[in-house]
Every structure is written in structure tokens, then in C-alpha cells.
Amino acid sequence: MTKVGLRIDVDTLRGTREGVPRLLATLHRHGVQASFFFSVGPDNMGRHLWRLIRPRFLWKMLRSNAASLYGWDILLAGTAWPGKNIGNANAGIIRETATYHETGLHAWDHHAWQTHSGHWSIRQLEEDIARGITALEAIIGKPVTCSAAAGWRADGRVVRAKEPFNLRYNSDCRGTTLFRPLLMPDQTGTPQIPVTLPTWDEVIGPAVQAQSFNTWIISRMLQDKGTPVYTIHAEVEGIVHQPLFEDLLVRARDAGITFCPLGELLPTSPESLPLGQIVRGHIPGREGWLGCQQAASAS
């Protein structure tokens, strides 16, 4: 049996309102639990449209047929009008999710984090994280114990900024296996659970066709030599490609794969995890930098 952590990112108002309820129903039908990470502040995702001038981002949008994949309400959110507050508008849905699944913070403002966190000060990072955690805790009525950086935009500064919040784990980067981020030679931070597998929008196109994606990604899960973690998005697998995701759950079960919340991947003694650090890097299929796992030593 292969155990795979299932991470569900919720970036937008529509993803929360429409995608999450469908995902909850789908997961319930198949007896699967996952980790949901919510954006709870303003939905300004449409402001990413200016990135179309960048060839890699434009190619990604064309390759994934973004207009039909996400919908124009997502692609234009927060452009001609102020972004609506996701948490306030969907508190009931978020509370229901937290009743049945591990629930953590993705971002206060997903667009702002993805665009500006790379040059924010530690204080600005802490203030933004605190705003998101406070809002999410007010909605679900219990402490937030985990987080996942929006767009995997994280580095050593983000690791340090999250330390005051006493989280059980963070999932801020791409990598191969769980690790303890090294803060100083004699100090480590909150355990990291990296995403190890590609997302739909990173690979779909000439190399991998939609109809063969599930076969392809299951093969990658079974071949993963580390601790497999897979990310889906409420805006994609919860709406347009919900049938594809349901088919994935069936195929994965038949292949001996069990999905679980990320928290279930943590060992009893986190001190046993290897040391590492998060550095800025790039991966195929994703425009811009993102946090990547790198080995480190205590010396």
C-alpha cells in the first residue's frame, strides 16, 4: 500500500463557493480525508493578468486553456472592482470542511503573497500570516495548526516568519521528503511537508494529454522514492475537472494507493526528520520562482 498526502489548495471565491462543496461530496463518497488550505481574505487573483506579458506565464495559460479551466470570474477577480472577502462570504463552507478534514491557512490575500512576499520584511510576513490565521480561526472556531504558502512562494525568511505561530507543520515548498528546516546551526524550525508531485496545470499539454493524465500521475505516485504529496486545486479538480478527480480516486485505490491528510505523514518524533532548508528555485511548467527543498547539515 502506497500512502500519498493529499493537499487541496483553495485560492479564490469561486473555488471556495463551488469547488469545495463538490470536493467534500466526492471525498465523502470515496472515504478519503485530505488537507484543505484556504485563502480567507480578498480575492484579487485577476490581477495576475498583467503577467501575460511574460512568455512562460502566457504559454502556461494557453497550454492549460485557462479561460475554460478557471472561468472568467476567477481570471478577472479584483481587477475592475475590489476583491470580495472569501472567508466572510463562505464561512459556512469553511467550517464544514474543518469538521471533516484537516484545515489550514493558504493565504490572507493569495495574489499579494504570490506577488510581494518575496521582498516583504520579516515583520510584514508575520503580519500577513497573523491576519490570515486570525481570520481562519474566527471562522472554524479552533486553532490553526498548519499552513501552505500560496504559490509555494517561500524561502528561509518565510520559515522564520512562521515560527511564532506554533504550527504543527508547514507545506511551503517543493521537494522529496519531510524535513526540519535549519534556522541556525543549533536550531531547527517547524517540520516541512513538501509537495513532491506535479500539479495538473504544470504538465498538461503536448507532453501529457488530459485523457491520460490520471494514468500518468498514478505512475508517478507509485514511483515516488520519497514521501509522496499531491496537490489539487478547488478551482480545477473541484469544478471543471471534478469527474477526472473522481476517476483518479477510483484508479488510485485500485492501484493500492491510499490518500491521507498531510498531518498523518508526520512521524511520532519529528526530531528524527532530516535537516534541510528552503531556497528559491524553478520547476518545469510553473512561471516564476518558488521554494525548493535543499539538503543541509547541522555543522
UniProtKB/Swiss-Prot annotation:
GO CC, alphabetical: membrane
A biological-process GO annotation: lipid A biosynthetic process
Keyword terms, alphabetized: Antibiotic resistance, Hydrolase, Lipid A biosynthesis, Lipid biosynthesis, Lipid metabolism, Lipopolysaccharide biosynthesis
Pfam family, one: Polysacc_deac_1
PROSITE patterns the record matches: NODB
Gene Ontology MF annotations: hydrolase activity, acting on carbon-nitrogen (but not peptide) bonds, in linear amides
Cysteine pairs bridged by disulfides in the record: none
The reaction(s) this protein catalyses: 4-deoxy-4-formamido-alpha-L-arabinopyranosyl di-trans,octa-cis-undecaprenyl phosphate + H2O = 4-amino-4-deoxy-alpha-L-arabinopyranosyl di-trans,octa-cis-undecaprenyl phosphate + formate
Pathway terms, separated by semicolons: Glycolipid biosynthesis; 4-amino-4-deoxy-alpha-L-arabinose undecaprenyl phosphate biosynthesis; 4-amino-4-deoxy-alpha-L-arabinose undecaprenyl phosphate from UDP-4-deoxy-4-formamido-beta-L-arabinose and undecaprenyl phosphate: step 2/2; Bacterial outer membrane biogenesis; lipopolysaccharide biosynthesis
Family note: Belongs to the polysaccharide deacetylase family. ArnD deformylase subfamily.
Name under which the protein is recorded: Probable 4-deoxy-4-formamido-L-arabinose-phosphoundecaprenol deformylase ArnD
Source organism per UniProt: Salmonella heidelberg (strain SL476)
